[in-house]
């Protein structure tokens, strides 16, 4: 929003005028598209759409040429963990060939670059927005308030 300033907020205003709604959870956002009640979902999670498409639903995904946000599913070890070795073993398990292949089969992006997604674009094939996350963090309250103002 900051990079495009007023143009970004104008886009949201136009979306609101076209009866764009802010849905709740991911499936709640996708279901109206699957049933035909809505024409599209913006910013939905892609893995659910790939799954619906594989089941024969008339849906597809288009990543904007300008880029999108990829939200990794992180796993980490707390510095105060009581069982660091067990936690390391669990992380190793999550990053194992078998689990990473299962992740790929669930239409999620593998966390390792040597394991490729078989049924969706890999992370390097998806255009990604260059986001200044420190600025987003500093301005998230202001942006959230403005977003609510537009869509309420």
Question: How does the language model describe each region?
Answer:
Residues 59-68, 73-76:
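Flexible, solvent-exposed loop/hinge segments that line or gate ligand/substrate-binding clefts
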Residues 1-64:
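Ligand-binding pocket segment of bilobal, Venus flytrap-like solute-binding proteins
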Residues 111-152:
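An extracytoplasmic/periplasmic, membrane-proximal ligand-sensing/linker region
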